[in-house]
Amino acid sequence: MSPLWRLVHAALLLATALLALPAAAATDCVIDAVAAAGFGAYDGMQNDGAMTTITGRCTNTPPPGTGPTIFPVISLSPGLAASYAPRQMTSGASRLNYNLFTTAARTVVWGNGSGSTATVPAYLAAFALSGNQTLAFNNPNLTIYGRIPPNQTAATGLYADTITVTLTF
């Protein structure tokens, strides 16, 4: 066999082997929406609460038992105050303390898992049972519970903060 023929033969074998490899799309998870949480007018005599939800999905997840299992987790940033204890909304130079929690009891601060904060798993519910699946978040804990504590002196104005929602999978 000539050296040229050996090279062509080796290239054909490699091409044939590559064609035989199965192709698979990578799993991808996204957050579809986070509704804005509106506290309304602050009442300095009692806790003010608000709720909002996170919706999302993962695509190209393998059927159970056929590939790696994914465990999406949602974390929240501390916001503009750069602290979870407490978070602060601002209106100009004025500040209003508040926080975001993992449950309606409002006892565990939703954060990034550092200090006394917790992240929340985004359990998945299958939309399809064969082939690669599209899965939606199906977890009652994907509600964010907010609270502004009472007895704060706050100047009149519109208060806001920006929270980054991170999905890790």
What are these regions (language model features)?
Residues M1-L12:
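Bacterial N-terminal signal peptides that target proteins for export
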Residues A20-P22:
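N-terminal signal peptide c-region/cleavage motif recognized by signal peptidases
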Residues G44, T103-A105:
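Residues that form or immediately flank small-molecule/cofactor binding pockets and catalytic motifs
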Residues R57-P63, A105-G113:
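Short regulatory "switch" loops immediately downstream of catalytic or recognition motifs
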Residues S75-G79, N99-T103, G111-G115:
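Predominantly extracellular/luminal cell-surface or secreted proteins
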Residues T107-L135:
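Extended, solvent-exposed segments with strong compositional bias
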